[in-house]
Regions:
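Hydrophobic transmembrane helix bundles of membrane-integrated enzymes that assemble
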Residues: 3-6, 10-262, 279-282, 313-400
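Long extracytoplasmic/lumenal interhelical loops at the membrane interface
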Residues: 263-331
Length: 400
């Protein structure tokens, strides 16, 4: 229990960056990350024998996702002139995958981990709500001056559908997981507390003001609505979705009117995204070395980092905006294949054992992978490590 509390404290300290805290110093964040990764390595080293004695269904996948990016150091040096030391610093976040092994050492329960994810989701919701009323006095999720200049903004936040859009660096990952979990609980036993939490989480997804996230969450809920045993469960799911659809239809103009107008008038933005995908895809496949290993991940103050900044400033080309194509540019084809192999194992190989809410999360993030890569950034590494550990708990339990 003490170790679990220590883990919780460390993750909470670093998670202030996950909420994009305005006063959080990037340099301090880097040093915090180095210390956390060093600690993870040390714990794994001293518990190596305990780890190898366990059956870890996703060990090979974790190792690939953690180590394949290291292969980009060579092409990044040869093609992009970024030194191996700078590349290693830029790739340090990938070692957060080590938490998968630490969870198998500490063995927290699924209930405890879901509680922690739920707390994070509720914190996100309250930040979204409170800052709508306190802006411009806010602590999280605004652009700095450089980002405002790059995006041509007059304010440090975007306004969509009449609401402020705060970028909390979570992409709805905590919220989606708990949303899908609560949905599953509602299907088995309709209780007021589940209903209230579900509505709060659905509102939080909407307040992200990210069209892809809203659509993929709703589509996934519909796709999985009729999964499950028992006619009562399916009838309850149908009735709930029916009433939810009526509410959405009545308030459609207020909730989504500006989204529809923005989508209709965003031809230029869509064209830029297509051109960006063509550019990064072409520059990846032209060289066999970068095709398989990628161009590497840039460190901000390097020639390579400034080159990508110039692409963003002058052309609006961001690798992160084109999903797995952009991450193939960073880490190569082998890395992207490793993600799809992982998704295949969760959804098909171990489908009988994996909890439905985890399958829903994998489907939801996969549906938008052409625009938002599912394994992008520290918080995704952390959350996926937790979910894969929970999958292992169910797989091990089924074999007893």
């Amino acid at each position: 229990l003490r170790r679990q509390r220590q883990m919780c404290i460390r993750d909470r300290l670093y998670s202030v960056r996950c909420f994009n805290l305005n006063s959080w110093n990037i340099t301090y964040a880097g040093w915090c990350l180095y210390i956390i990764v060093l600690y993870f390595f040390t714990v794994k080293l001293f518990n190596y024998r305990k780890i190898i004695r366990q059956h870890l269904s996703f060990k090979s996948d974790i190792d690939k996702l953690m180590l394949l990016p290291l292969g980009t150091i060579i092409p990044c040096w040869l093609v992009q002139s970024q030194s191996p030391i700078d590349s290693l610093k830029a790739l340090c976040p990938h070692f957060i995958w080590l938490i998968y092994y630490l969870l198998h050492i500490w063995k927290p329960s699924e209930k405890r981990l879901l509680y922690l994810l739920g707390v994070m989701a509720i914190i996100v919701f309250f930040i979204q709500i409170i800052q709508q009323f306190t802006y411009p006095i806010v602590v999280c999720g605004t652009f700095d001056e450089n980002e405002m200049l790059r995006k041509g903004l007059l304010e440090d936040v975007e306004i969509r559908n009449g609401l402020y859009r705060f970028r909390l660096n979570t992409n709805g990952i905590f919220t989606m997981i708990i949303l899908f979990y609560v949905w599953g609980r509602m299907k088995t036993k309709m209780m007021m507390k589940y209903f209230i939490v579900f509505i709060i989480l659905l509102a939080s997804i909407y307040l992200s003001l990210t069209r892809q996230l809203i659509v993929t969450s709703l589509v996934t809920l519909i796709l999985f609505s009729f999964c499950g045993k028992g006619i009562k469960t399916k009838i309850a799911s149908f009735l709930f979705l029916f009433f939810l659809s009526i509410v959405l239809w009545i308030y459609f103009e207020q909730l989504f009117g500006e989204f529809i107008e923005t989508t209709s008038s965003s031809t230029s933005e869509d064209n830029i995204r297509i051109l960006s995908a063509i550019y990064f895809g072409t520059n990846t496949i032209m060289n066999p070395l970068t095709l398989f290993l990628g161009n590497g991940f840039p460190k901000n103050d390097t020639i390579y980092g400034r080159f990508l900044d110039d692409l963003a400033d002058y052309w609006g080309f961001f690798p992160e905006d084109v999903g797995f194509i952009g991450y193939m540019y960073f880490y190569g084809l082998l890395y992207v294949i490793a993600y799809f192999r992982l998704a295949y194992k969760v959804l098909l190989v171990y489908r009988k054992y994996v909890p439905t809410y985890i399958k829903m999360f994998v489907v939801a993030t996969g549906l938008i992978s052409i625009m938002i890569y599912p394994l992008a950034g520290i918080m995704n590494y952390l959350v996926w490590s937790i979910l894969l550990y929970i999958c292992d708990l169910h797989i091990i339990k089924s074999s007893l």
